[in-house]
């Protein structure tokens, strides 16, 4: 399994707009792609403009195929296009150790 962590810094006071873009535009496009497992948007408690978007994929090839499509809706750059001033940094990880399975959270955690 493969995980992608995207660190996102929203412009001051714009995290609600960021959350809406991710929940309504970005994640629906990404979740329809082959190999997608789940995604979680984490909002930092002590810094209201800082977020982490964690995505889980079957393997690294699945996310690389997504990035190669060039489809803007499936690209994290769609957020930058719709929310000027946002800062985005991505990192990828191969998951070597895991315990637990809570897939239902992927359906309900965005509210």
Task: List PLM regions with ranges.
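Short, well-ordered beta-strand segments in beta-rich or mixed alpha/beta enzyme
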Residues: 2-8, 38-69
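Residue-level signal for secondary-structure boundary sites
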Residues: 14-16, 61-63, 98
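An amphipathic, aromatic/His-enriched active-site/gating alpha helix that lines ligand/cofactor pockets
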Residues: 24-25, 29-37, 56-91
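Alpha-helical interaction segments
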Residues: 15-16, 26, 30, 46-47
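Short, flexible segments with low predicted structural confidence
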Residues: 1-3, 18, 34-35
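Short, surface-exposed ligand-recognition loops at beta-strand->loop->(often short) alpha-helix junctions
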Residues: 9-22
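Glycine-rich beta-strand-turn "strand-cap" elements at beta-sheet edges
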Residues: 2, 9, 40-49, 74-111
């Amino acid at each position: 399994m493969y995980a992608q962590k995207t660190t996102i810094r929203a412009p001051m006071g714009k995290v609600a707009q960021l959350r809406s873009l991710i929940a309504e535009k970005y994640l629906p496009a990404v979740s329809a792609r082959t190999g997608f497992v789940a995604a979680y948007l984490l909002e930092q408690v002590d810094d209201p403009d800082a977020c982490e978007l964690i995505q889980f994929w079957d393997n690294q090839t699945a996310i690389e195929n997504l990035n190669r499509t060039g489809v803007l809706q499936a690209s994290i750059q769609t957020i930058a296009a719709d929310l000027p001033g946002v800062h985005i940094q991505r990192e990828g990880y191969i998951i070597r150790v895991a315990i637990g399975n809570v897939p239902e959270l992927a359906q309900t955690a965005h509210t």
